[in-house]
Amino acid sequence: MPIRRQLATSVKPEVLLVAPIYKPAQAKLEATYTTHSLLNASDRTALISEVAPRIDVVVTSGGGAGIKRALMEQLPKLKLIACFSVGLDSVDLAAARELGIAVTNTPDVLTDEVADLAIGLMLATSRRIAAADRFVRAGQWLDGGFALTAKVSGKRLGIVGMGRIGQAIARRAAAFDMQIA
């Protein structure tokens, strides 16, 4: 019995970009898929109306536009919402679940970077590093010393939320003998 082959199609899945994402990632999306962007659309409503019947995927970022039920319901072919972020708080997850739309994110992608920055900002604030830098650059050190600053070692650190990032911050704070509250 002969094997029937499905004809290859040149039709690319269509993607709606609703928030800015990392430029190299956007370039790959545009090379692989037919991409429509709301970012610079002069008439967002008209663009959505025009492309809605063909959109398979919506792509967004954590700091970007939210994906609400109303938009999902306008896109009858929508199968996936891809979030280039750790959090999903900008997506109506209940609506996506109810409408059978998969939602993805990028957990752990920036956990270490965010934790490192949090510790760096804590040190910069408590030790007044930016102010001390300005003091030295302005030549004020010739007139006297910069005021003493506070140490962080042995202090108590309050962390709101002990998810991946909170735990990574706590591990780093342990190196400063900090108590976690």
Residues of each region from the PLM?
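N-terminal glycine-/charge-rich "phosphate-binding" loop or analogous flexible N-terminal tail
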Residues: 1-62
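Short secondary-structure boundary/capping segments
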Residues: 6-8, 26-27, 49, 94-95, ...
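Rossmann-like dinucleotide/phosphate-binding beta-alpha-beta segment
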Residues: 10-11, 31, 146-181
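Structural detector of well-ordered beta-strand residues that form the stable sheet scaffold
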Residues: 16, 80-82, 102-104, 158, ...
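Rossmann-fold NAD(P)-dependent oxidoreductase module
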Residues: 28, 117, 121, 168, ...
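Phosphate/diphosphate ligand-binding glycine-rich loop within oxidoreductases
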Residues: 56-137, 147-149, 153
